[in-house]
Each structure stands twice: as C-alpha cells, then as structure tokens.
Amino acid sequence: MFEKTNRMNLLFDFYQELLTTKQKAYVSFYYLDDYSLGEIAEEFEVSRQAIYDNIKRTEESLEKYEEKLGMLKKYQQREKLFTQLEAQLTKKNFLDEQVKDTLEQLKNID
C-alpha cells in the first residue's frame, strides 16, 4: 500500500493539472492528507461509494497519462543518472562545491 501511495502522489504531482477540480480534491484528500473515504464523503456530502469510484477512475486516468507521457518514468531515470554521476564524481574526487551546486541545480529544474 505504501508503494502505491507514493506512486499515486508522484503521478498526482506530474499530472494534476489534467484532472478536474473534483478529482484533484478527492485525490488530494485521500492520498496527500490521508483522509478516509468516509471523511471525504462527509466533507463533500456524497456517498462513500461515489468517492471510492471517483478515486479509482482518477487512479486509472493518472496511470493512462503516465503510460502515454512517461513523465514519472523519465524523472526517475534522470534521478538515477544524477545519483550515479554524483557517486562517480565523488569516488574520483572530482566533486567540488561548484560541481555539486551545478548537479543540485540540474536536479531541481523539473
């Protein structure tokens, strides 16, 4: 469950602008704020089942966006390469403060 929650949070970060206002709200409450389905249903005055169905459809939409656009996959690949590069430079004592700062800036561009 923890892995799924992390994945949904990352997908939400990348693709939230493609979601409706309602989808954003439900997913935000559920995954980011850790509300239960019942708490969200009470907040929006709808059934627990309506919240569940909407969140499931939104999860499917987020996965479809990722399948087509691949933003999370590319981000994870870049992070892995930056980590490898940093380790290689550190190992060879090439990692001075200026290079370290540049690597950090590259990581933070997205």
UniProtKB/Swiss-Prot annotation:
| Protein family per UniProt | Belongs to the UPF0122 family.
Q: In UniProt terms, what function does this protein have?
A: Might take part in the signal recognition particle (SRP) pathway. This is inferred from the conservation of its genetic proximity to ftsY/ffh. May be a regulatory protein.
Q: What is this protein called?
A: UPF0122 protein lmo1802
Source organism: Listeria monocytogenes serovar 1/2a (strain ATCC BAA-679 / EGD-e)
Q: Which cysteines are joined by disulfide bonds?
A: none
Domain of life here?
Answer: Bacteria
